[in-house]
Amino acid sequence: MSTSSVRFAFRRFWQSETGPKTVHFWAPTLKWGLVFAGFSDMKRPVEKISGAQNLSLLSTALIWTRWSFVIKPRNILLASVNSFLCLTAGYQLGRIANYRIRNGDSISQLCSYILSGADESKKEITTGR
């Protein structure tokens, strides 16, 4: 590849509507940090993972994945990072659901735990009720 073609490719990337001078580049680039945090949480014990946090990550990832195809210019980088965020948050929610159901929680208890993070056994210990 000649230096002129490399310069042309770099100039084209630099001046692109989704290039590094725009939020269309930096927002998805920095959002990869959330994906990497989700990957690192796969090593954490499931009891220490927040259901509410992963539900909100899943929700925003779904919304922004859809939105990245609606906005002009269409932003594939934003769609890709949010797709991976959706996968990691969904996986973590699956881990939480599997753990809670195997330990005897009903579906309603599981939903309550994911939405509020409240654990009835912890309330009894801390409040004395």
Curated annotation (Swiss-Prot):
Residue intervals on the Mitochondrial matrix side: 2-22, 72-74
Biological processes annotated in GO: mitochondrial pyruvate transmembrane transport
Topological category with respect to the lipid bilayer: Multi-pass membrane protein
Mitochondrial intermembrane face residues: 40-54, 92-129
A GO cellular component annotation in the UniProt record: mitochondrion
Main subcellular location of this protein, as a coarse class: mitochondrion
Signals that turn on the gene: Mainly expressed when grown on glucose containing growth medium.
Compartment(s): Mitochondrion; Mitochondrion inner membrane
Entry's transmembrane regions: 23-39, 55-71, 75-91
Catalytic activity: pyruvate(out) + H(+)(out) = pyruvate(in) + H(+)(in)
Keyword set includes Membrane: yes
One Pfam family recorded for the sequence: MPC
Phenotype when the gene is knocked out: Grows more slowly in amino acid-free medium (SD), when combined with disruption of MPC3.
Additional notes on this entry: Present with 3410 molecules/cell in log phase SD medium.
Quaternary organization: The functional 150 kDa pyruvate import complex is a heteromer of MPC1 and either MPC2 or MPC3.
Name under which the protein is recorded: Mitochondrial pyruvate carrier 2
Organism the protein comes from: Saccharomyces cerevisiae (strain ATCC 204508 / S288c) (Baker's yeast)
